[in-house]
A protein has these predicted regions:
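GST-like domain detector, emphasizing the conserved glutathione-binding G-site
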Residues: 1-123
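Short, contiguous strand/loop micro-motifs
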Residues: 3-4, 169, 193
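Short polybasic/polar patches that bind polyanions
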Residues: 21, 166, 187
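Aromatic-glycine hotspot motif
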Residues: 48, 59, 132-140, 190
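Non-transmembrane alpha-helical segments in soluble domains
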Residues: 62, 66, 80-83, 136, ...
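Short, hydrophobic secondary-structure boundary micro-motifs
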Residues: 73-76, 105-106, 148, 173, ...
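GST-like fold's C-terminal all-alpha helical module
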Residues: 90-180
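Long hydrophobic alpha-helical segments typical of transmembrane helices together
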Residues: 176-198
């Protein structure tokens, strides 16, 4: 039986959980522990073990679940672009969240001096914030039909938005398309059952 290792609050793990739930395959979820994290060569979640096969990236896990169950994974360029943009923003948002654990004021106070190699932490932080804002505006331009069957682009976007709402990392005020999309996705039982606060 396949085992997916992760934490319930991870948006990457959530996408894998949704794909596996839709697959009809036999699998189980294991909350990662300090001991089990060592089963992954990257020492991060999500990872899946199926016999001798270990997959260490959520996109690969989702693809594997889709292929094993005869379902499509990113069937169009448009869906792949939605998936990629949502993943890029998600990566940036998670990175900033982990850097300051939700305390943007503390990181904003980082000294503005640069390191010996020219790295300026404050400039880095500000640039990442700009990427998030621009990326979310870009996502709000997509035509988002939130009706089943959902694509992996839709699911990745919903995982991003719901995690950002849960962690209060992205302001969706005035982004009506994204808000409406997330509201509809939260009504889908497979997505609702994997909410980060459950």
């Amino acid at each position: 039986m396949m085992k997916l290792y992760g934490v319930r609050t991870s948006p990457y793990v959530r996408h894998a959980r949704v794909a596996l739930a839709e697959s009809g395959l036999s699998w189980q979820f294991e909350q990662v522990t300090p001991d089990t994290i060592n089963l992954s060569p990257t020492l991060r979640v999500s990872f899946l073990i199926d016999g001798n096969l270990t997959l260490t990236d959520s996109a690969v896990i989702v693809r594997y679940a889709r292929e094993q169950s005869g379902q499509a994974f990113l069937p169009s360029v448009g869906d792949h672009e939605l998936f990629a943009l949502a993943t890029s923003i998600l990566d940036t948002t998670v990175n900033l969240y982990l850097l300051n654990i939700g305390d943007s004021a503390a990181l904003a106070e980082v000294a503005t001096g640069t390191s010996a190699i020219g790295f300026n932490p404050r400039t880095y932080y500000e640039r990442q914030q700009e990427r998030i804002v621009a990326g979310v505006r870009g996502l709000d331009q997509f035509e988002l039909d939130a009706s089943a069957p959902f694509t992996d682009g839709h699911i990745r976007l919903a995982c991003l938005l719901d995690w950002a709402s849960y962690r209060e990392t992205i302001d969706l005020l005035g982004l009506n398309k994204l808000n409406d999309f997330l509201t509809r996705m939260r009504e889908w039982p497979t997505f609702a059952e994997t909410a980060p606060d459950l």
